[in-house]
Amino acid sequence: RKLAFRYRRVKELYNTYKNNIGGLLGPAKRDAWLQLRAEIEALTDSWLTNALKSLSIISTRSNCVNVLVTTTQLIPALAKVLLYSLGGAFPIENIYSATKIGKESCFERIVSRFGTNIT
């Protein structure tokens, strides 16, 4: 029960701040985060902006969804998704952590949920 409550709370926080991580950070950390994001964009030839555009295009298609599989534990992975402003592109239900169950099990769950006609 305690674990279920914790995950409901995590889902609530994720959905609340998925399009506004600055609201969770507070003014001082938000400004530092925005500066860091600007530096990352400058050093990486705007990879995050381009990734967000691609993910946004995919999510607007009626028969497409974005799914994220990571070997990072779930809570840190969700934090990273929010910090990179990817929360709007990935519903929390479509983020899978392979840390405890392995990649193969994650992909089996994805196939059972979405079917085999996936790209």
Curated annotation (Swiss-Prot):
GO molecular-function terms, A-Z: protein tyrosine phosphatase activity
Localisation per UniProt entry: Cytoplasm; Nucleus
Keywords: Activator, Chromatin regulator, Cytoplasm, Developmental protein, DNA damage, DNA repair, Hydrolase, Magnesium, Nucleus, Protein phosphatase, Transcription, Transcription regulation
EC number: 3.1.3.48
UniProt KW Methyltransferase keyword: no
GO-annotated cellular components: cytoplasm; nucleus
Main location: cytoplasm
Origin: domain of life: Eukaryota
Cofactors that this protein relies on: Mg(2+)
Catalytic activity from the UniProt record: O-phospho-L-tyrosyl-[protein] + H2O = L-tyrosyl-[protein] + phosphate
Biological processes annotated in GO: chromatin organization; DNA repair
Cofactor note: Binds 1 Mg(2+) ion per subunit.
This protein's record includes keyword Nucleus: yes
Function: Tyrosine phosphatase that specifically dephosphorylates 'Tyr-142' of histone H2AX (H2AXY142ph). 'Tyr-142' phosphorylation of histone H2AX plays a central role in DNA repair and acts as a mark that distinguishes between apoptotic and repair responses to genotoxic stress. Promotes efficient DNA repair by dephosphorylating H2AX, promoting the recruitment of DNA repair complexes containing MDC1. Its function as histone phosphatase probably explains its role in transcription regulation during organogenesis. May be involved in development of the eye.
Family: Belongs to the HAD-like hydrolase superfamily. EYA family.
UniProt name for this protein: Protein phosphatase EYA4
Lineage, uppermost ranks: Eukaryota, Metazoa, Chordata, Craniata, Vertebrata
